[in-house]
Curated annotation (Swiss-Prot):
This is Photosystem II reaction center protein K. GO terms for biological process: photosynthesis. One of the components of the core complex of photosystem II (PSII). PSII is a light-driven water:plastoquinone oxidoreductase that uses light energy to abstract electrons from H(2)O, generating O(2) and a proton gradient subsequently used for ATP formation. It consists of a core antenna complex that captures photons, and an electron transfer chain that converts photonic excitation into a charge separation. Keywords: Chloroplast, Membrane, Photosynthesis, Photosystem II, Plastid, Reaction center, Thylakoid, Transmembrane, Transmembrane helix. It comes from Adiantum capillus-veneris (Maidenhair fern).
Length: 58
């Protein structure tokens, strides 16, 4: 149990590092797009509610 718990903590720390990683210089022009990409699924969720409101929640 303690082994799996420490592995979980170790992996979560590495995952946190990945969120703060910078793109290589060759891809620096895509940085604004990459900043917006995590929000795109939220737009689809909101689109579902707008669509249902448009069809009167059938």
């Amino acid at each position: 149990m303690t082994v799996s718990y420490s592995i979980y903590l170790e992996n979560s720390l590495h995952f946190g590092d990945a969120l703060l990683a910078k793109l290589p210089e060759a891809y620096a022009i895509f940085d604004p797009i990459v900043d917006v990409m995590p929000v795109i699924p939220v737009f689809f969720l909101l689109l579902a509610f707008v669509w249902q409101a448009a069809v009167s929640f059938r």
